[in-house]
């Protein structure tokens, strides 16, 4: 998790709870309204086929595996020690406590997924939702030029094969499960933002970016633990993260 903190900077503006809540609701409405025939057509045109390279199961290629609440139930049944608070906590209050929208799978020292062995998933039949839909997606993000638009696939031309001639029923199923994942993810994010808003209002708290930055620097230098509240099933679970031992 320590390295992950170095990879992403969250601006003060984006950490306004109301702003992020509004954006998440708009994104959900956009996903729900995206034309199904268009999405199916894009999937069919791409014709992606997995070639079992396992690159998507590494931190270098895919950063982390975020878990929906339903995923966490399954993963904890398999191995409760295989999860950790997701990287990039969204908020930090004035007392230095962090708040993050969910859990992620742990990784091995080499950066590969904790469940990856010999380029194969040990829990394939029970793998998390994002692993089932990857590399497909349905959300808006900026391209290299900064232009924001809809994206339907990750890592284009970086793995797998393309133009494989998928049949219509397969494309429709891919579209269905991908849309379902994106909607579930956004609903979890909306629930998280609403829960943080209520918690902050009730307890006289607020997000303070300078405290966020200072605590992260101290953590990366091994000077402190982090108190992280992880959103799960409508509530927060407290986790204490210890700094990496050199």
Task: Indicate residue ranges for each PLM-predicted region.
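Short loop/turn segments that flank or connect secondary-structure elements
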Residues: 1-246
